Amino acid sequence: MGYLKRLVLYIVIMVMSVFIIGCDKSSDTAENPKEGSKEAQIKKSFSKTLDMYPIKNLENLYDKEGYRDGEFKKGDKGTWTISTDFAKSNKQGEMNSEGMVLHFNRNTRTATGYYTVRTTYDEVDKLAREKKYRVEFKNNKIVLLDKVEDENLKQKIENFKFFGQYADFKDLKNYKNGRISSNENVPYYEAEYKRNNSDGNVKKLREKYPITTKQSPILKLHIDGDIKGSSVGYKQIEYTFSKEKDDETFMSDFLNFGPSHSK
C-alpha cells in the first residue's frame, strides 16, 4: 500500500514538473522569439537595411550593394530608393502629408526625386490636392529644381532630413512582445511593437514633427514580398502616434534596393 502511494506521488510530481517546464518554455518563446520564427525572420530581413541607419552621408548609397535577383539586367548596379513621409489630420475630414523620395542610381551616380505636399479628404467625391517639387541630391545637399515662392516651404525642402539619416535601430533584436501577422499567399509579413516616448527614435520624431498627442506610438515593420528578399516587393516602417479620427498622426519610411530600369 505504501509503495502504491509513493508511486502515485512520484507520477504526480513528474506530471507537474513537465507542466511547469512547458509553461516556462512558452513564456521564453513569447519574450524571446526562437531563431526561425516569423518574428525573428522579419527582424532579420529588416536588419539588412536598418543596420545602415543612421546614414550620415546619403551619397554613400552609391557604393552600397543590395539584394539582387533575376529582375536585374546584366550590368545594372541597381538603385537605392529612400523615402520619408509625415501625415497628420489638422482639420476635420482632412489629412495633410509632406515628404520626400530620392532615387540613388548607382550606374550614373545621380540622385533625383520629389518633395510632395498632399491633402486628402474623407469625402469620396472630393479630389485630393497634390503638389510635387523636383529635387536632386548633390554634394550631400538637397537642391531644388523647381521654383518655390513660399520661402518657408523652400527652406523646409532644402533642409529636409530623411528618417534614415538620424534613426538608430541597433537594438532591434531586443524588441519584444511583437504582434505578428502574415499571409504567405500574398505574401506579406508584419510585426508591431509598442514603443515608449522615451525611445530615442520616438524622441527625434517628436522634435522634428508637430506631434501633439502624448500617446506612445506603435512601430510597424511591414514586408510586401518574399521575406528572404525580393526586388519586386518592398519593406516599410511606420510609427503610428494616433488613429483617432481627425487626429491621425503617423510617419512612414522606407529604404529599398531595386533594378534601375524600374525607377
Curated annotation (Swiss-Prot):
PROSITE patterns: PROKAR_LIPOPROTEIN
Keyword set includes Protein transport: no
Signal sequence segment: 1-22
Transmembrane domains' residue ranges: none
Keywords annotated in UniProt: Cell membrane, Lipoprotein, Membrane, Palmitate, Signal
Keyword Transferase set for record: no
Lipidation (S-diacylglycerol cysteine): 23
Parts forming coiled coils: none
Membrane topology: Lipid-anchor
Family stated for the protein in its record: Belongs to the staphylococcal tandem lipoprotein family.
NCBIfam families membership: SA_tandem_lipo
Name of the protein: Uncharacterized lipoprotein SA0402
Species of the source: Staphylococcus aureus (strain N315)
Taxonomy of the source species: Bacteria, Bacillati, Bacillota, Bacilli, Bacillales
